[in-house]
């Protein structure tokens, strides 16, 4: 087994990387035996080829860098499949399961419209913004990898699959310990998404589901929302403009703190096919006029 990212294609494709190479160590190979240092120059692969890329970057990809220096792949040509463990870019010998720095893989495949298959993302200990925008704009992406972490980090999955218009099924999301903005806009504008993940967490964090399924126009059924402890803006605009959504989840909130802000703000605005209107608990109604709140915010 070769510990590296593996790239294949259906026709001639050029793969390169933009961003700052300073402090990074990456190698490439066409046979998994003969390795050469990669200086981000263009690498060509044909239908019968496999390109391998690996690294030794124990401090992570984007540690201490400005956003305009973050590294990201570029692909031009045919459709591209990417296999292998993403952590082979961090330490191909040991394959750690800990993300070593904040924003580590930020935008790594952003706008790679040729990418159809995502690599494995096995890390169980995440870092702030580690997968933010990672596959944003990957309009050909149809297959994602598992996301096994059960404890999340601030904005770790935010905008991760934004605009992945070919994605029909979301990966499982087993996390029970959330973080601020962890799922913010994760699937926004995934217009083909039909199968949504279960969301098992019972205690929410500020903006955790903010715009999570915004404009997912193929989604017909929302996931169950079992949370009993909410947070500021936790569900804000979560299903906004999900024009095919027919069934809304129950909102079984048992604990609401006085002063809680925007937890259901705009949650179902623009859901023009909705057949059942969500109902809030009596404890919530007692804190404001429910009808007014629904008209102005929830629906």
Spans of features found by a protein language model:
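Negatively charged
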Residues: 1-299
């Amino acid at each position: 087994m070769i510990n590296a990212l593996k790239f294949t294609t259906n026709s001639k494709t050029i793969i390169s990387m933009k961003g700052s190479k300073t402090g990074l160590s990456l190698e490439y190979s066409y046979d998994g035996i003969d390795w050469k240092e990669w200086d981000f120059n263009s690498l060509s692969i044909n239908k019968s080829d496999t390109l391998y890329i690996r690294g030794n970057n124990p401090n992570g990809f984007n540690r201490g860098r400005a956003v305009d220096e973050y590294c990201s792949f570029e692909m031009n040509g045919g459709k591209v499949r990417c296999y292998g463990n993403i952590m082979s870019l961090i330490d191909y010998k040991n394959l750690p399961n800990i993300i070593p720095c904040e924003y580590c893989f930020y935008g790594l495949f952003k706008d790679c419209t040729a990418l159809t298959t995502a690599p494995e993302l096995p890390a169980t200990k995440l870092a702030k913004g580690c997968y933010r925008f990672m596959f944003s704009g990957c309009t050909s992406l149809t297959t994602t990898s598992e996301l096994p972490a059960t404890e999340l980090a601030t904005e770790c999955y935010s905008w991760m699959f934004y605009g992945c218009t070919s994605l029909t099924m979301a990966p499982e999301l087993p996390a029970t310990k959330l973080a601020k903005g962890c799922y913010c806009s994760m699937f926004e504008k995934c217009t083909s998404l039909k199968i949504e993940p279960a969301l098992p967490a019972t205690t929410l964090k500020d903006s955790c589901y903010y715009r999570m399924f915004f404009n997912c126009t193929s989604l017909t059924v929302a996931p169950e929302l079992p949370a009993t402890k909410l947070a500021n803006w936790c569900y804000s605009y979560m299903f906004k403009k999900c024009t095919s959504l027919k069934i809304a989840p129950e909102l079984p909130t048992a604990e609401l703190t006085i002063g809680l802000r925007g937890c259901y703000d705009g949650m179902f605005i623009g859901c023009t096919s909705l057949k059942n209107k969500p109902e809030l608990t009596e404890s919530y109604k007692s804190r404001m006029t429910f009808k007014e709140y629904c008209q102005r915010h929830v629906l």
